[in-house]
């Protein structure tokens, strides 16, 4: 069993958490003295930057909702598509040598990659996806409607198919999952829309490609009822390995929340018992989940969705206004960019090693790359 005691961190880090709980949400005006180049350096104008479409429906994009660079092959950009339960992989992404690879929409994709909301890579090159559905995914005589949760995958392109044969494991306690973030080893956090919680999944040992055994996992349901999903809009997550803080785009509550994952105490066991013994799935009660950024106090924030922790800053997209913000880790607004994209377009965002910004456009089935103009 995972040795996870919920005893909190050192006094120094606990002090940081307390400060976050009480800190202001940041200024609501411009800060031209602290402009960020990739957001227009205080101009907030997309015309001050280079924005290019690097992938579209011809590459298999079909309502793309999240994207992430491979943890070991940093030139590969992986994208998940809700429209047909699929994924698109861009090789040499954003360069003149770019090629696209399509996976999914195959045997088992309607369950194992059902309406994906988000993906997250671990450091060993495996990755996990989470899915927005609480419908039957294996036919009228198959598994129940709530038999959904995160899927663990190999990223070996000779094996990965986006379906049953390419999956390494799957757990089934979080229908309507809206975001996912990697913690360590085989541990992932999920924005659990069905239970309005942040749920920690430890897959432990996977069953191998195409297997079926799920019984060695551990599932912890944190801060139940304190976050709220919004249908059709992913609520992305970012886990900070240095502080054990989980940052949350809490879309339904129009805020950015922060959960101190080391707080709380083990509570009661919970169902449904589809995967693991009863004592291996339980609530964690009394954990600290506070508001870092109140969307009501930020101009044009109404449906925060994409969230990335990069370069010591939090980067947030708004699904309604297509604005991208950067905040410091105390919740202070640093800069923002108006992309000019459609209502409903922006969801997941990502950065490459050179600091270029990538985002999905779910309305137009595109991935865009934003770069600072060369002089």
Per-region residue spans from a language model:
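C-terminal motif of bacterial Sec signal peptides marking the signal peptidase cleavage site
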Residues: 19-22
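A short helix->beta-strand "capping" segment at the edge of beta-propeller domains
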Residues: 35-61, 284-293
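Beta-rich, blade/repeat-based domains predominating
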Residues: 58-74, 109-126, 167-187, 221-243, ...
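Short loop/turn segments immediately following the C-termini of beta-strands
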Residues: 72, 81-84, 131-134, 192-195, ...
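Conserved beta-propeller blade signature
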Residues: 76-80, 126-129, 187-191, 245-248, ...
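Short loop/turn segments immediately following beta-strands, especially the blade-tip
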Residues: 90-99, 154-161, 201-213, 259-279, ...
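Short, conserved, GDST-rich strand-edge loop motifs in beta-rich repeat architectures
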Residues: 130-149, 200-201, 259, 266
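Blade-level signature of beta-propeller repeat domains, shared across WD40, Kelch, NHL, RCC1
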Residues: 344-375
């Amino acid at each position: 069993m995972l040795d996870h005691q919920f005893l909190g961190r050192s006094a120094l880090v606990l002090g940081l958490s307390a400060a976050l709980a009480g800190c202001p949400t940041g200024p609501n005006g411009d800060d031209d003295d602290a402009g960020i180049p990739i957001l227009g350096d205080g101009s907030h104008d997309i015309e001050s930057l280079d924005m290019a479409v690097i992938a579209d429906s011809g590459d298999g994009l079909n309502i793309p909702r999240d994207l992430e660079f491979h943890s070991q092959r940093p030139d590969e950009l992986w994208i998940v598509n809700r429209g047909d339960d699929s994924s698109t992989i861009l090789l040499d992404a954003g360069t003149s040598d770019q090629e696209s690879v399509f996976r999914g929409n195959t045997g088992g994709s309607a369950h194992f990659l059902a309406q994906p909301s988000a993906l997250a890579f671990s450091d060993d090159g495996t990755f996990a996806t989470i899915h927005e559905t609480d419908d039957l995914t294996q036919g009228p005589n198959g598994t129940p409607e709530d038999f959904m949760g995160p899927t663990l995958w190999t990223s070996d392109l000779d094996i990965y198919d986006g379906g049953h044969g390419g999956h390494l494991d799957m757990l089934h306690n979080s229908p309507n999952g809206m975001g996912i973030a990697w913690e360590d080893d085989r541990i992932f956090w999920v924005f659990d829309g069905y239970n309005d919680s942040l749920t920690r999944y430890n897959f432990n040992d996977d069953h191998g490609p195409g297997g079926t055994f799920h019984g060695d996992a551990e599932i912890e349901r944190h801060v139940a009822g304190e976050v709220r999903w919004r249908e059709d809009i992913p609520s992305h997550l970012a886990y900070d390995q240095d502080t054990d803080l989980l940052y949350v785009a809490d879309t339904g509550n129009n805020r950015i929340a922060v959960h101190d994952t080391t707080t709380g105490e083990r509570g009661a066991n919970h169902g449904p018992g589809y995967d693991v013994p009863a004592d291996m799935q339980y609530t964690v009660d009394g954990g600290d989940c506070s508001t870092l950024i109140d969307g009501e106090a930020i101009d044009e924030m109404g449906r925060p969705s994409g969230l990335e922790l990069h370069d010591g800053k939090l980067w947030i997209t708004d699904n309604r206004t297509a604005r991208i913000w950067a905040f410091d880790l105390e919740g202070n607004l640093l800069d923002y960019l108006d992309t000019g994209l459609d209502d409903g377009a922006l969801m997941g965002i990502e950065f490459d090693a050179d600091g270029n910004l990538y985002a999905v456009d779910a309305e137009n089935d595109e991935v865009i790359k934003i770069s600072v103009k060369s002089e």
